[in-house]
């Protein structure tokens, strides 16, 4: 189980990313439209003035049950060992262990 503070920090980053998503996207589109270097620099300054935690690269996928940051399956939003436990106890419909 991840520390509660790390999980809360990740939730805060997700909120910030959603809040500034449209602004960040519009600034990046402007950069591609503008051809003058001086105008591009102004737009880059605006982009850099946004909060650092609002960048999508700062987000980390976490297991929604345990908060574990590694070995996550995107389809289920679960870490590997929780996914395995849920499949073994038949809590995930349609998921089966492979055998050949």
Swiss-Prot record:
GO terms for molecular function: rRNA binding; structural constituent of ribosome. SUPFAM superfamilies: Glucocorticoid receptor-like (DNA-binding domain) (SSF57716). GO terms for cellular component: plastid; small ribosomal subunit. It is found in: Plastid. InterPro entries: Ribosomal_uS14 (IPR001209), Ribosomal_uS14_bac/plastid (IPR023036), Ribosomal_uS14_CS (IPR018271). PROSITE patterns: RIBOSOMAL_S14 (PS00527). Keywords: Plastid, Ribonucleoprotein, Ribosomal protein, RNA-binding, rRNA-binding. GO terms for biological process: translation. NCBIfam families: PRK08881.1. Binds 16S rRNA, required for the assembly of 30S particles. Belongs to the universal ribosomal protein uS14 family. Part of the 30S ribosomal subunit. This is Small ribosomal subunit protein uS14c. The lineage of its organism: Eukaryota, Viridiplantae, Streptophyta, Embryophyta, Tracheophyta.
